[in-house]
Amino acid sequence: MKKLIFLLILTISCNNNIEIKPQVIAYYAGDEKSINEFDLEGVDQIIYSFLHLKGNKLAIDDKKDSLTLLNVINQKKKYPKLKVLVSLGGWGGCETCSDIFSSKKARIEFAISTADIIESFNADGIDLDWEYPGISGYPGHSYKLEDRENFTDLIIQLRKYMKKDHILSFAAGASYRFFENSIEWDKVMPLVDNVNLMTYDFYGSGSTKTGHHTALSSNEFQDRSAESSIEALMNLGVKPSQIFIGGAFYIKTFKNVANINNGLHQNAEWNRSYNQINFEDVRSNFNFYWDDVANSPYAYDSINKIFATFDDHKSIKLKSKYALDKKLGGIMFWQLMNDKKQNGLLKTMVNTIKP
């Protein structure tokens, strides 16, 4: 086993020494036809979201999802440089992951089934979105201390059974709890291509105060940010070129927010989320502001006492520039269906990463 791990690390390490150009990664959770409506020029990867476990194996849920995946992969004909990955899990989509992946036999069966799906669909790899190994995630989903080591072996098995040129990545929670308890970074990172750092959802349905849910920088009221998360990963020895900063193409809102400091860092109750399109229906109710310290936009509806937190063109541009300045692997975002078809946030992202 030690020899196998060494050979796998050596192979991937050689690949990691190649000069990496910053990339744009898009998660896609849409239907079969909508993907055709987006301009994907400049997008390096689309991660089709999501596939799930069926017993010990990776499985596509139904025929509709198969057709959608096929059409996403067909985009490679129009965009020859595009890579398409499948993703396991997502929020609420990995209910049995902890239990299934506790078995060596199951991890091997999963890896074999993953390689089969990638080959049969002519996909380019897999992104693991297990939320979360070793710590609590979706309410009611099991987790155990051993998940951390089991995740490492899961990566080893995937590398063993996937082709060498297939991409292997995973989505990581942007919290110190995740960093410390979910991943054996020194063992996992030499075997994967990159980590997609979910630098969003810092505030959400469980929050009792408002804040920037996808802040680039920290401020005196909010420690969690993209910068602090990335610095923490680097301190754990993760190479900048393997880290992708995350952008959020959706808006989170909170209600019953007092008209103090334009609603920022105030007591609140969760309201709802919007995408870039349906937020236009209520946009006129809001006044828009910018936090110079957190490098983040926010908005406040003083009539209805609603606070909104999001990424906009300015913050996406700053995140993209940060990725360039820090020589990160690039920037990723959740998700394409939340964007506008014309002059959306993706266009700003691509134009900044690839001027």
Q: What are the residue ranges of the model-derived segments?
A:
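Short, acidic/polar
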Residues: 28-42, 104-120, 176-187, 230, ...
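Short acidic, glycine/proline-enriched helix-loop-strand junctions
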Residues: 137, 142-151, 164-166, 291-293, ...
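Glycan-recognition patch characteristic of GH18 chitinases/ENGases
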Residues: 18-118
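Sec-dependent N-terminal signal peptides
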Residues: 3-13
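Glycan-binding loop/region signatures in secreted carbohydrate-active enzymes
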Residues: 88, 247-322, 348-355
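Substrate-binding surface in catalytic domains of secreted glycosidases
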Residues: 25, 54-67, 112, 133-281
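Conserved, mostly hydrophobic/aromatic
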Residues: 46, 86, 128, 158, ...
